[in-house]
A protein has these predicted regions:
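Cytoplasmic-entry segments and transmembrane alpha-helices of multi-pass inner-membrane transporters
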Residues: 1-30, 52, 57, 62-66, ...
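Alpha-helical membrane-interface segments at transmembrane helix boundaries
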Residues: 12-19, 99, 103, 107, ...
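Residue-level signal for the membrane-embedded core of alpha-helical transmembrane segments
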Residues: 22-29, 114, 123, 149-153, ...
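Membrane-embedded alpha-helices of multi-pass transport/permease systems
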Residues: 46-50, 54-76, 106-107, 114-118, ...
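Short helix-to-coil transition segments within interhelical loops
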Residues: 68-74, 78-98, 138
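Transmembrane alpha-helices
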Residues: 86-119
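Glycine-rich helix-loop "coupling/hinge" segments at transmembrane-helix boundaries
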Residues: 116-146, 150-151, 171
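C-terminal transmembrane helix and the adjacent membrane-cytosol boundary/short C-terminal tail
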Residues: 146-173
Length: 173
């Protein structure tokens, strides 16, 4: 790597693996006291931002690491051997080469965030999840349930199609 820090890498890797191993609904409930401390409440869309962000971070961090690891190290060595510095490597090789994979990771993360935000509705996070639970499930209103499911499917399909199109336009395969 450019600036190897094996101890920090091992520590961050362990934290990321722990974060990825927790089911989101468990994390959501476990973070209630922390959310109350940070935001002052555990209800509403503002409160939902805390667990949704903490839940998505390890997933996106691992996708980013994998995207950057895919870049051919020969290109990095070539830039360094021609007198380039770390910034040249980052902006002339790492980011341009990893961009399609990074965008695919961003697309996956956005899709996951849609699901996470819906799950946050279960504990009062608002949004479509709250609508589905309160007005669909608890009131036995199948039309509301199916309507929210259709909206969620449409949102995910739209994000995925746009992300795939963007990745295809930037990939140099």
């Amino acid at each position: 790597g450019l600036a190897p820090m094996p101890k920090l890498n091992a520590l961050l890797g362990a934290v990321i693996n722990i974060g990825r191993s927790l089911p989101f609904i468990v994390l959501l409930i476990a973070l209630i006291p922390f959310t109350r401390l940070i935001v002052g409440t555990t209800l509403g869309s503002t409160a939902a931002i805390v667990p949704v962000t903490i839940g998505a971070f390890p997933f996106f961090a691992r996708l980013t690491e994998n995207a950057l690891d895919e870049v051919d190290y020969g290109r990095i060595e070539a830039i360094l051997s021609m007198g380039g510095n770390v910034w040249h490597v980052i902006f002339k090789s790492l980011l341009p080469e990893a961009l399609p994979t990074l965008l695919a990771g961003i697309t996956l993360t956005i899709v996951m965030l849609i699901g996470f935000s819906s799950m946050a509705g279960v504990i009062g996070g608002g949004g479509l999840g709250d609508l589905a639970i309160r007005y669909g499930y608890q009131r036995f209103n199948n039309e509301v349930m199916f309507g929210t499911v259709l909206i969620l499917v449409a949102m995910v399909q739209g994000v995925q199609m746009a992300g795939d199109r963007l990745v295809r336009s930037l990939a140099h395969r």
